[in-house]
Structure formats: C-alpha cells, structure tokens
Amino acid sequence: MADGSSETKSSNQMWGGRFASGPDAIMEEINASIGFDKKLYAQDIRGSIAHATMLAHQGIISAEDKDKIVHGLDTILSEIDSGAFEFSRRLEDIHMNIEARLAALIGPAAGRLHTARSRNDQVALDFRLWVKEELQKTEKALTGLIAAFLDRAEEHAETVMPGFTHLQTAQPVTFGHHCMAYVEMFGRDRARVRHAIEHMDESPIGAAALAGTGFPIDRHMTAKALGFREPTRNSIDTVSDRDFALEFLSIAAIAATHLSRLAEEIVIWSTPQFGFIRLSDAFSTGSSIMPQKKNPDAAELVRAKTGRVNGSLVALLTVMKGLPLAYSKDMQEDKEQVFDAAESLELAIAAMTGMIRDVTIRADRMKAAAGSGYSTATDLADWLVREAGLPFRDAHHVTGRVVALAEQKGCDLADLPLAELQAINSAITDKVYGVLTVEASVASRTSFGGTAPSEVRKQIAWWRARN
C-alpha cells in the first residue's frame, strides 16, 4: 500500500460485522462528519431519550435498561457541555460517538437503544430539531429588527427625504415611510419563518432505514415528546427529505438579500456626498493610514455575507438534485451549508439591529436633498389634472417642459415666475406653488400605504399590534 494510505486494524464496531478489514485512512477522513455534526449533540441526546422512553413504554426494552440509557445520556450531555467529552473521527459521526460512550458507561444496555431505529431517521430527526430551533431564534431576531425600525419610523414619521428610483431623485417621501418599507420586507421574512416552522413540524423518528420497522413502536408518542405536531406519514420520504433544510436556506437567502439592500443604502447614505446618516462608533471602523476615515464595515460585511448564504442554498440544491429516494451519503453534505448560513444570518441581523438603533439621522441633509432633482414634478402634473382638467399624459408633457425650463434657468420649480409657467400652459395659476414644496408633496400622499405622515402612523400602529 502506498505511503499516506493505510488501513485501520479493524472496521467500525457499530457496523463492521460483514467487513474483513477496516477502512483506508483516506476513506475514514472523507467519511467522517464528527468535525461538524457534533453541533447536533443536544438534539441527538434528546431524540435518544425520547426513543428509549417509548421503547420501554411499548415493552420493547425493559424499564431498567431504559433508566440506564437515560442516565448515561444525561451524563454524556454534561460531559459534552463541559468540554470533557473526547470526539473520535474513527467513530464517524455524532450518533456513533455518543453510542460508543454510552456503551462504555452502562455496558450492554446501550446496545438496545438502536432497536427500531436507523441513523437515517436519527440524523433526519437531529437535523430537523436543530433547524426548527434555529428558525425560532431567527423569528425572535427578526422581531427585534422590526421593533428597531418601528421605533425609528415613529420618530421620523414627518422627516422628509428624497425617494429614489434608479438611485435618481424621484419624489419626496418620509424617512418613517422608508423605514416601514423595511418593516414590510422583514415582516415577510418572519412570516416565512413561521410558516416553515409549521410546515416542518413532523417527527422523522421511527421511519428507520427507509421501510419502517416491525417492532410495535409508537411514533405519535415520540413526536409528542419531542415537541412535534405529528409523525411523518411516509417512511421513504422521511429519510429522503431535506426540504426543511432547503426551506431554511431559502428563507435565509431572501432575508439576507433584504439585509444586503439595507446595507447598501447605509453605505451610500453614510458617505459625505449623501450625508443622510451618521453611523455610531460601535458599528464603524477606521483606517490604518487615513486618520479621518470612518468606515461602514459592519454594513459592508452584512452585504458580503449574503453571498455566503445564497451560495449555501445553491450548494444544497445541487447536492439534492440528483439523488434517488431514501438516504445517500451525499446528504452528509447538507449540514455545513445550513450551519454556516444560520451563523451568517444570525450575526447579520444582530449587526443590522444594532446599526438601526444607534444610527444618527441627519434630517436637515435629508430635507435639503428631498427637493433636488425636481422631485415635486409629479405634484405639478397631478395639479394640472385636478385643477386644469388636463389628461395625465398631457399634464406629463407640460410638466416636462416646465422641468426643462427650470434646468435651463438653474432653479427649482417653485422659483419659476408665474408668467413663464403660464407661457407654457395658460391654465397654470399662482395656486400651483402650494403643491411644489416637499412638505406639501408628502402630506398629499394619503392613499392607503402612502408616504403621508398620517398614513405612516397608521402603518406603524398596524405593525405595533402584530409585533
């Protein structure tokens, strides 16, 4: 055998009965998942306790063996929590590491734990429990982010700023209204989280390898003990399924995309050229060479982490796309994608919540910019429709000529003399000046969901009652 490739003296004791020799060292390395799936230890122990309790209740194992198993598992949980537990790559994964330690602690009774169970349904359970718990954390984190935006929206319901399309000044809006747009976005993310929790609320344990088991188990009992609504209905689908992980990654990718869009605006708005916001020192960094710099690194890192989260979704979709039904070892590659995406999303939400709570809003700069770029041109067109009876397309054309005149003269629309306005369209009167201020513009947008402060406060109240 070539250098760097050797066999272990014996095969894995948990499955090696039909093997004459152990795996090659490279096989052992590629096969092992303990380096990352040890993160599932609490879920694995919780599932094993529920399984052992059910086996005893059904008379499949003795109450005495069940008590030994539960006591041993509690001991192992304490060992792992304290850092005293030694994980072994030779034992491949978290399931067999725990089972081997259990055998060392309680002897032959440990061998009864795996009755009516396979690692296929065991890992499906552990992973599903972990994802469910992570979704619950994400729901709580999103609720905190929404609350931060609601507070800023309430504070700035009347703060006027430019609204943009194509990153060009479009119409005046309020900063409170802009904040509420993010409330809606992150509210949808939270709704997706809640739906996913409900959608995946089925227990896989008891499906065994793929065909179920001939032992008289009670899957409803274990489902209830583990906090699931009910057991899964098809044993083949149960061990084939990673939809719950894909749903989590999809939710994470959409939420991360929303966070990235927010991060982009924070980066832009904090530049001297915009100057709409001032980031706190707590969420900024400096430069090693330029002493004047205050960099929005937290926002930039949130923006960058979106690529990692999106990549995790694509990676797992690609893993799953060619698999026949039931378990394939490919599915071992599911966890690192989810673990990494969950960590990235959790950190990104926390960072963004902190930035939103701490950021200083420069209302004077926002208001000054709100009137730039002829942002009240639509108000002029609307006035021509209401007061002069013009069809909107004609009003649009007239307003375009007015904007061209203002550009030529280098002034705002409100600074054009009435005579020059009337030279373009004789129906224009001095009352038009009343709609050309940014304050009048936002106050007039009273349609449901509009930017008028009165509407923004209604939006805030609606969300306060639901957050």
Curated annotation (Swiss-Prot):
The record lists the catalysed reaction(s) as:
2-(N(omega)-L-arginino)succinate = fumarate + L-arginine
Gene Ontology terms for molecular function: argininosuccinate lyase activity
Q: Which domain of life is it from?
A: Bacteria
Q: Sorted alphabetically, which keywords does the UniProt record give? A: Amino-acid biosynthesis, Arginine biosynthesis, Cytoplasm, Lyase
Pathway terms, separated by semicolons? Amino-acid biosynthesis; L-arginine biosynthesis; L-arginine from L-ornithine and carbamoyl phosphate: step 3/3
Q: What is its EC number?
A: 4.3.2.1
* Matching InterPro entries: Arg_succ_lyase_C, Argininosuccinate_lyase, Fumarase/histidase_N, Fumarate_lyase_CS, Fumarate_lyase_fam, Fumarate_lyase_N, L-Aspartase-like
Give the principal location in a single coarse category. cytoplasm
Q: What's this protein's name?
A: Argininosuccinate lyase 1
**Pfam families for this protein:** ASL_C2 (PF14698), Lyase_1 (PF00206)
Per the record, the GO terms for biological process are: arginine biosynthetic process via ornithine; L-arginine biosynthetic process
Classification via NCBIfam families? argH
Q: Which GO terms describe its cellular component?
A: cytosol
Where does it live in the cell?
A: Cytoplasm
Family statement drawn from the similarity comment of this UniProt entry: Belongs to the lyase 1 family. Argininosuccinate lyase subfamily.
